[in-house]
Structures are given as C-alpha cells and as structure tokens.
C-alpha cells in the first residue's frame, strides 16, 4: 500500500504529513519513497547502468554524482556497468535493485525480502549495505523473514502474524525476547 500498488481498505499512509493513499506510483516516488521488490526484478536485457538510470526516471537533475555514489557503495556494479543485468549473479542483481532505488534520492526505501535466495556470505554483505544506507540518513523499511539479521540492523521492529502486529520494540530488544527467539530465531 505504501508503494501505491495496493489500495488500503481504510486509514492513511503519511509521509512528512502528506497522505500517500490514492497517489499514483510516480507521485509516491516523487515524494521520496522507493521499493526494492522481492525477487530483485531487474530489467534483464538492459545494462547495469541503464537499470540504474531507470531508477532516476522522474529526476531532471544530473545523475553523475548519484551514479558515482551507487558505484562507491557497490564497486562490483561499476566493474559491470555495461553488462546486461540478466547475466549478473543473484547477489549482484540485489545490489543493482538497491542501487536503482537509491537513484531516486529517496527519504524512505522499502526492501522486500532482500536476502531471499542469496548465499549467507552475500546476505551479510547486503545487510551491511542496509546499515550504511540508514547511516546516510535514509529511512529503511525492511520486510524480511530472516528475523535474526533483520533485528540486528533494526532501530525499531514489528513482528506481524497474519497481517496484525503482535510485538513491537527496539530491534535489539526483540532479538533478546524469549517469545521471538522461540518462534522466529529457532532457539
């Protein structure tokens, strides 16, 4: 609903005091919200750089500084900037999906299952990047089944079951919560 893909049955979604409900997806992106979808969804036949430029499709300013910033965050993408996105590894495609979202200069970046299907070493790298994005002042809304990794990077966390919030608190507090440990962390 926040990205404008589904209309909520009731309520409001406020970002800096502006209600996003009923706004088109391009209006939502213009307001500072981007999405890194589950399964990466890169444009396979386009190059890495073309995919990144698509992330900035609503912008009218120069992209050079932001391309450089994404390439600094993901040096591997710089090495492959002219390679077709469909030939990248799963981890590289995830980096590209995150980089594409960053090209819109978001205030809020939503990430849906960024660890899905990735090797454990790649997952650790992705979560380090999530920390770095947040350190840069961008709010990250993380939807993730890897509760252990998600809670380690979360300032605030919410546990949902069948669409309802059942627990909330600081990430580190929920990481140490016995009910969360038993149900989601396997301990």
Name these PLM-found stretches:
Residues 1-187:
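Glycine-rich phosphate-binding loops of nucleotide-dependent enzymes
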